[in-house]
Amino acid sequence: MVNMKSVALIVIVMMAFMMVDPSMGAGECVQGRCPSGMCCSQFGYCGRGPKYCGRASTTVDHQADAAAAAATKTANNPTDAKLAGAGSP
């Protein structure tokens, strides 16, 4: 028969599993990148949730970020567009 110590241990273990943060990480970022759907925190670890995807983190899609930054730079600096040949006859 199950004694009270066993029941208490089972309850404690179950409660510990429930208290685990659902945004737990999945290891370190590799060259600033994480598996799909995860973000790289400011400290270099992958995960989900505000601790990883907050303002101080980098997003998974670095290529889209770089393209948007380049487009903004070109739009804000017409000299770059001329040097790139934009608007040439």
UniProtKB/Swiss-Prot annotation:
- What are the residue ranges of the propeptide? 56-89
GO MF annotations, alphabetized: chitin binding
- Tell me the disulfide pairings in this chain: C29-C40, C34-C46, C39-C53
Q: Which UniProt keywords apply?
A: Antibiotic, Antimicrobial, Chitin-binding, Disulfide bond, Fungicide, Plant defense, Signal
Instruction: Report domain Chitin-binding type-1 positions.
Output: 26-68
Point out the signal peptide segment: 1-25
What is an annotated GO biological process for this record, any one? Answer: killing of cells of another organism
Function (record text)? Chitin-binding protein that inhibits the growth of the fungal pathogens B.cinerea, F.culmorum, H.sativum and A.consortiale, but not that of R.solani. Induces morphological changes in the fungal pathogens F.culmorum, H.sativum and R.solani, but not in A.consortiale and B.cinerea. Has antibacterial activity against the Gram-positive bacterium B.subtilis, but lacks antibacterial activity against the Gram-negative bacterium E.coli.
- What is the name listed in the Swiss-Prot or TrEMBL entry for this protein? Antimicrobial peptide Ar-AMP
